[in-house]
Amino acid sequence: VNGAECEPYLTSDYRRMLEEPEKVIGGLKIMLHMFPRAKGVICIEDNKPDCIAKFRELVLPEDNIEVLELKTKYPQGAERMLIYAATGRKVNSSMLPADAGCIVDNIDTVTAIYQAVRFGEPLMSRIVTVTGDAVQNPCNFEVPVGMLLSELLEQAGGLKNEASKIICGGPMMGKALF
């Protein structure tokens, strides 16, 4: 489980890990049920010690789940780097994670798996971080899939000054909308 969230300024995974760790672990348990010989590894960067401590406490009784504390460095959350950090296996550009015997899912994906299997709820929303110097009230919001950017900015109190750039995703790997 990719809990690295290595993109600067993004905090949605961090909040989910703090507020709903049981759902994250529940989703991972469902995945492990489908692959009985597999081992679950929850990878979290060391700049989130509160999350690491909480997850370690919650997985203590689980024989097939561990929490791996990663050094905080970019791009630690990149799939290939995460696999190498967790397993020591190298995944080159022509390979898929499955070629290394791995599945990498992020915090929101395993939470969505839990919600779908446990409660029959489809993925209808996601947590997004709205931040930056131009944002009136930087915050994380759970919003419906497909919400307009203008509505999202309105929820954050609008802009306090003109934005020089709007990026969808993180500043390193995201896409500049303008």
Predicted regions and their residues:
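A structural-propensity feature for long, helix-poor, extended segments
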Residues: 175-178
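Cofactor-cradling patches in redox/metallo enzymes
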Residues: 14-22, 46-47, 146
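Major-groove recognition helix of helix-turn-helix-like DNA-binding domains
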Residues: 166
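Histidine-anchored nucleotide/phosphate-binding helix
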Residues: 18-34
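Hydrophobic alpha-helical positions that pack around
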Residues: 41-149, 155-162, 170-171
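Metallocofactor- and cofactor-centric catalytic cores in central/energy metabolism, strongly enriched
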Residues: 12-18, 34-37, 43
